[in-house]
Each structure stands twice: as C-alpha cells, then as structure tokens.
Amino acid sequence: MTFCYPCRAFALLTRGFTSFMSGWPRIYYKLLNLPLSILVKSKSIPADPAPELGLDTSRPIMYVLPYNSKADLLTLRAQCLAHDLPDPLEPLEIDGTLLPRYVFIHGGPRVFTYYTPKEESIKLFHDYLDLHRSNPNLDVQMVPVSVMFGRAPGREKGEVNPPLRMLNGVQKFFAVLWLGRDSFVRFSPSVSLRRMADEHGTDKTIAQKLARVARMHFARQRLAAVGPRLPARQDLFNKLLASRAIAKAVEDEARSKKISHEKAQQNAIALMEEIAANFSYEMIRLTDRILGFTWNRLYQGINVHNAERVRQLAHDGHELVYVPCHRSHMDYLLLSYVLYHQGLVPPHIAAGINLNFWPAGPIFRRLGAFFIRRTFKGNKLYSTVFREYLGELFSRGYSVEYFVEGGRSRTGRLLDPKTGTLSMTIQAMLRGGTRPITLIPIYIGYEHVMEVGTYAKELRGATKEKESLPQMLRGLSKLRNLGQGYVNFGEPMPLMTYLNQHVPDWRESIDPIEAVRPAWLTPTVNNIAADLMVRINNAGAANAMNLCCTALLASRQRSLTREQLTEQLNCYLDLMRNVPYSTDSTVPSASASELIDHALQMNKFEVEKDTIGDIIILPREQAVLMTYYRNNIAHMLVLPSLMAAIVTQHRHISRDVLMEHVNVLYPMLKAELFLRWDRDELPDVIDALANEMQRQGLITLQDDELHINPAHSRTLQLLAAGARETLQRYAITFWLLSANPSINRGTLEKESRTVAQRLSVLHGINAPEFFDKAVFSSLVLTLRDEGYISDSGDAEPAETMKVYQLLAELITSDVRLTIESATQGEG
C-alpha cells in the first residue's frame, strides 16, 4: 500500500532512537490529546473488536487508516486502550527492526501543503512484507480502521460521492468541535500479511495494488455508514411524476374520475406528500442523543447479535431490506438506533399511516419513515405511486425496512406474513436494477412491551384505540424499568440467489418500464415470506422474563418454589444450550439463579416467604399479560415439550412410536410457529433431544424405549405443559371435523373458537391467543394442505378421528369431556 509516515519521529526511529514517545512528538500528542479527550466521545464498531473480529493480541497488530489525521489517530488510540488492543503510538519491534504500528493510505489535504515522503511510505509497507519473507513464523495482522466525525450524506448537487472524506486541519478542527460526540471508530476484519506475502509476494507493486484495494475498502465503508446523497424532495417528486407508470396512472385517474389532467396530477403529488420520507441527518443526530439518554435509563442493556454479517453485506454493495418481527411501536426507534450504532445507515421505514399524526408523523418522516395505508385496493393511483416510490428508494441505494407481518403481534407469536410490500420489492428487481437486493430477517425481543396490556384487551374484544398524541403521552408516562432488549440479525436472504435457484428464468420477466406480475410471482413471494418468518424465529432470543413466564405459566397454580423454578430454568437452559434451536438463536449465559433475580427486579412476580423458603407467584391479573413473553420463545421449546407430553402420558414409549406421534402433529406446529425443521430432519432432532433429556435425568433409555424418571417427573411435567394449550386447540378442531366431516371452513373456525372460549372459562386457561381467530384460521388452512380436508371441503373422517384419538391421549380427561360435550350440546 502507498503510505506516509505519520510524523518525522519515525524517521528518527530508524536512526537509532529507542523510544518513539519521547521529546517533541510526545509533547505534541499530549497537547493535542487534551482537547480531544474533552470534545470527542467516540464509539467502537464492533463494540468489542478483539473477540468479535477474531483478533489475536498475542500476534503483532498494525493499523491502517485512510488518510493522515492526528485527531483520527488519537481517537483510534483511545479506543484501542479501552479495548486492550495495542497502542498505535507504540512502535512494533520485529527481528530487531522498529516499525510504526499505524500507516496512512493517503496523505490528505493540508491548509499549507508540504512535502509528503510518499516513496518512503511505500518502502515502509514493503518493509512489513519483506520481514515476512525473511521470517516464515511472522504473521502481522493488518487491521483497517476508519474514524468518522459525523455521517451527513449531503444533498444531491450533481457531483458523485467522494471516495474518501478528506479534511484539512481547519475543517477537521470544526468537525471535531461540532461532531466529536457523534464519532465512530470502525474496525474491519484483519488481513494476514503472512497470507499476502505467501500468495502475492513482497515487492513494491503488491504494496501499490493493496493501496488501491484499501482505498476502495474505505470508500465502500463510508458509503455503508453514510449512505447515498439525499435528493431534494421536490426533485424526487418531479422524477416520479415523469415516470411512465405514474404518468399512465394519472391519465387513468383523470379519465375514470372525469377530472382534468392537472387535478389528477395534483392528486398524485398529494399522495407523494402523504407517502414520502423527509430524511434529516440533524434529526437523526438529535434523536440519537435523546434515545441514548432514554435507553440508558429505561433499559438495562440492548443486546445485538450477528451485526457483522450485515455490515459486510453493506460493505459489499448489497441493497439491504430489513425485515423485522413487529412487537411494539418501539421497534421503529430501537432498530434505527441499533443500526446507526453498528455503523450502518438508518433505513427508510415503511410505517402504518396510523402513525402519521402530529407531532409523531413529522418526526418519524425526518427519521426516514414513509407511510403506507392498510390496503391498496380500489386505488390504482395510490398503489402505482407507492410502488414507484419504493422502486426509487431501491434504485438510489437506500436501505429499506418494513414489517412483513403487517402489524404488531398481539400474542407474542409471529403473525402470518402480509406479502404486498415484499411483492413490490421483487417487482423492483424486475426493473433491472444492478445492485443485489438482500433481505435481512431480524428478531426483536423485549423483557417488557409497553403495549402488552392493550394487546390483551384487544384480544378479548376491545376496540383498538386510534394512535394519537394523548395516547402516546400516556404510553410514555408508563415507561419504567424495561429490562433488556434484544436485536438478533438472522440469516440474510439474497433475492437474486433465491430466484436463481427457484425461478431460473426470472430474468426473462425484467421490464425496465412497467411493473410486471409474472405467473411465478405470487407463489414465489408466498414461499419467500414463509422462509423469512422461519429465519426470524431462528434468531430468537431467550431471556430471563420469557423463561420465567414459561415455567410459571406451566404450573397449574402459577407458582413455584424458588428451587423448583431454578430447576425448571436449568432444564430449559440446558435444552437450548446443548441442542440449540438454531445457530442464530441466543440463550443467556447467566445462571438460572441470576436470571430469576433479574426477573424479580421487573416487578411482574410476587414472592411469598415462609420458614421453608421463597415461593414465586405469577399473580392472576399478570398471568394473561405474561403469556405474551412466553409466546416469544414458544417455538424454541415446543418440540421438547411435545416429546415430554407424549412420554408423560405413556410412561414409556419406543422411539419409533414417539417419532410416529410427533410426525403426525408436526405439520400443524410447523405452520403455526414457523418451525425450522423439515420432516426428514425430525429423527435426528428427536434423537438429540431424547439424549439431552436422558442426560438431565428427565427420562431413562432402556432397550430403545423412553421411560419417565419418577425422580424428576415434576420437571418433565412442567416441560410438557408448554405444549398443553396447543394440543387442546388441535383436539377441538379435530373433534369438530370428526363429528361433522362436511362442516365448511368458516363454520369450523367459528365453532372451534366458541369451544376454545368455553374451555378457557371452565378450565382457567389464561392465554388470549387460545381462541385467537388467526390461530384457528391458520390451523384450518394447514389441515387442508395436509389432506385432512378434501378439495370439496369435506373432511376425511377416518384420518381426523385417528388424529383426535392421539390428541385425546395427550390432554386431561376433564378437558376431553368438555370438548366432546360442547359439540354434543350444540347438536
């Protein structure tokens, strides 16, 4: 690489000085560091560079920066010292040779130009490579680092983005003064100079080539952090109006409504005003300060996992589409905050039009929100304007975020996906864009959701309250201790790769002018949406609250002694750690006792003390609300819970029969909870879970049979209770189908809900989703897909009765009698 000496002290080093930090350079850096230590409060990306990037501090490390800046160098030094990384101002001694530990790619502009020893800089880097030639055991880790003061993308003025943002001394002074507390030190994965020397040699031409690659690396990194320049809003509207699709829609609007062309065009502009974001970097900065202050007081921590894979995709030039689950209105702010602090551009966010009220609407708009109506039906002009606006965001290179569920989950489970915006995303690809679009599934989890009380009321029939300023203020006034927050980035889905695999001829449908809907679009979008939901659940996060709620709700009296709760949490934790749900899911590293202590601090549970010990109680009024948190991780425990239910009921059962039972019920569970395994993967998963349950002492294995272990029967029963309500719901629907094979789909869903509500009252089932309309609708669709209901709508009575009998064995006799008597009473 082409490098320059950071200062003349390094020239003195090579002439025999034993310490760099002596004399004038030492005084200079100390004087410069004094104001920087006051003005600059930088953040490291990633948060803990050494472990997250796999840096080996026992091996030599040198830093590469994009351009000569002492302020950048000292900012880097502060982060290195804070994270136990080598001090960049301390030279490296290798085989008796002293070399500076940092190198600048570019000399950078100056107020007063002076000679920069470019050739000596190239020689310096060449010396690093040459040392690897003479010492085969040497392996220096070269770590590219960029330091950014502020991340304003600027406005479009016709010029292209500069490859590097180089500032002279005066400009840097004002940047530090104004943006010192909005600065980031971005560490990139290291490059092995040993590998470079072995594979490419050590001559000066290699250094020059590496310099070009490094310049490209830093330019891409800046684009990933800052994003493309922002257009003037009116210029964007003019471009949209000039598009053929909107021009045609305007003509159709004028003709169909018998209005003038000018009036139809004004209608289109009004829709653009309603939809379009008005992104403001200053609003991002201000909100970041406010949220940073707020999060630190409300949350005990925001846990982020797998962000590096997203940073790499942004660096590689992918068009990123963030697809998170939707738990709360807080999701909008939390995800943008996390992305900003991961060195990525906050995305343009598709927000429901219900949030476009004063003052939230204008604020959200400046934070990147663009607003979407609940339905596009019957308004061709609106759908065309929205689709063209979304396509324009993609073509300009802005990252986008939308909630594929279409709304917030009221139950804590993932909702069935709404595919409209996803379909438009693929249509944008069919316009022939050059940048690859990649979908990023994201799991967002909380230990406290501020709307959870409202959700419970809505599930019990209350009318949804319209979003407004008073409602927002009431919600904010209730914010107290929110515990931990979780943002887990799931496995990315590159759309081009997906289409190449599943629709090899998709490029034949590319039309740069018109939005097309080829025959393969709808089924492909449905499959992609289902896959996204699975990937979101794959990134699930277990935490103290959802684990404790799962255990306490499994108890008939919603109470356990502290010892029992500890034992149950250990069961869950060991299952999740030793047989992970997926490589992207996360499990707390804390002990069960520590998790219980943390959960008790959330003030959701009561503790009764007696002479024997503590009893932890989930109050009845809290029980309904706590099902929300249990449901967040239901998918991670449902398979071991089902196995435990089967073993508990049969007392002992062979692996083959257990496998048969699971195989019958699994398709319904997979569809309802978006489980990750295909049927052919089940035997290996069940074997792994059975072995883990044996290791825990929950069961014993004898002659290929699973036997209940009486010594740990309570723990096994509590584990089994995790599937109890799901099995009861299935039993209701299968009994109704068996009793009336010709029942139509609508009636089946309605009667299933009626019986479920009756069961809920008679048997004290507190879960609102137990009789949720969407859950039964999804179940009936799955029964049709699995062949239990024929194309004509009639059930297969022999098959449905067989499944009902299997389910009847897994539910209690009193619940079974309630189900059967309810339908007989109707007859």
From Swiss-Prot:
It is found in: Cell inner membrane. It is a peripheral membrane protein. Its EC number is 2.3.1.15. Keywords: Acyltransferase, Cell inner membrane, Cell membrane, Lipid biosynthesis, Lipid metabolism, Membrane, Phospholipid biosynthesis, Phospholipid metabolism, Transferase. The HXXXXD motif is essential for acyltransferase activity and may constitute the binding site for the phosphate moiety of the glycerol-3-phosphate. Pfam families: Acyltransferase, GPAT_C. One of its GO terms (biological process) is CDP-diacylglycerol biosynthetic process. One of its GO terms (cellular component) is plasma membrane. It comes from the Bacteria. It is an enzyme of class 2 (transferase). It comes from Escherichia coli O1:K1 / APEC. PANTHER family: DIHYDROXYACETONE PHOSPHATE ACYLTRANSFERASE (PTHR12563:SF17), GLYCEROL-3-PHOSPHATE ACYLTRANSFERASE (PTHR12563). NCBIfam families: plsB, PRK04974.1. Belongs to the GPAT/DAPAT family. A motif (HXXXXD motif) lies at residues 325-330. This is Glycerol-3-phosphate acyltransferase. It catalyses: sn-glycerol 3-phosphate + an acyl-CoA = a 1-acyl-sn-glycero-3-phosphate + CoA.
